[in-house]
């Protein structure tokens, strides 16, 4: 089979056996489906937008970038975030899946940051192979192994009194969150999604408990 990776426009896709889409933001995938209903297609490149591992506040002067999934556009925007990319392809059974750019951080192409940043931070893993938060998002929905991952870490000195968005990536049916000894809501996990709570930061501890079929199976 012949395939092609397209960043826009249908002309180059017409002779291909398998259409490859580089970024749903740049391609009219739904229109192509109507125009070429028999065309096989996949995501030949879709961004993760993962940012700097362990960083939850932008500091571009230090080369630090928050993951796009947690930016104001949100995970349901088409703008460069891992969650929307996976949802888009999972919701469309006529698409064969996707390749994420990238698996690892790499030297060069620091977009959207400038010097002193010298490398891309869009990897699912950092330069040393340590998983970023978004690796746990994918593991939640790509494996049957129970997953329960909390972010951010709770060592946020300097942000005392600030309202913090606490997220959980998990494939549990429900998750209950406790912040500094106070239980917050127990929430059902949406398919291919995440859960979030707001809490005012004070030093202490955050705990999550995951439930399957009404039974506690994980605690973090």
Where are these regions (language model features)?
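Extended substrate-binding grooves/exosites of carbohydrate-active enzymes
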Residues: 1-188, 194-215
């Amino acid at each position: 089979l012949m395939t092609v990776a397209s960043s826009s426009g249908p002309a180059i896709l017409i002779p291909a056996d398998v259409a490859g889409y580089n970024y749903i933001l740049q391609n009219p995938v739904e229109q192509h489906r109507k125009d070429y209903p028999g065309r096989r297609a996949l995501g030949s490149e879709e961004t993760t937008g993962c940012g700097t591992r362990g960083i939850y506040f932008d500091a571009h002067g230090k080369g630090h970038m928050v993951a796009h999934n947690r930016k104001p556009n949100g995970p349901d925007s088409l703008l460069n975030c891992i969650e929307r990319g996976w949802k888009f392809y999972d919701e469309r059974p006529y698409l064969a899946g996707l390749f994420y750019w990238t698996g690892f951080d790499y030297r060069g192409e620091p977009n959207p940051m400038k010097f002193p940043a010298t490398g891309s931070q869009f990897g699912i893993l950092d330069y040393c192979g340590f998983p970023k938060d978004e690796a746990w998002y994918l593991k939640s929905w790509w494996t049957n192994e129970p997953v329960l991952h909390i972010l951010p870490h709770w060592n946020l000195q300097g942000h005392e009194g600030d309202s913090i968005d606490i997220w959980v990536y998990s494939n549990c049916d429900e998750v209950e969150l406790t912040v500094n000894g106070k239980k917050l809501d127990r929430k059902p996990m949406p398919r291919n999604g995440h859960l979030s709570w707001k809490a005012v930061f004070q030093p202490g501890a955050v705990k999550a408990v995951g439930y399957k079929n009404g039974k506690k199976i994980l605690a973090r």
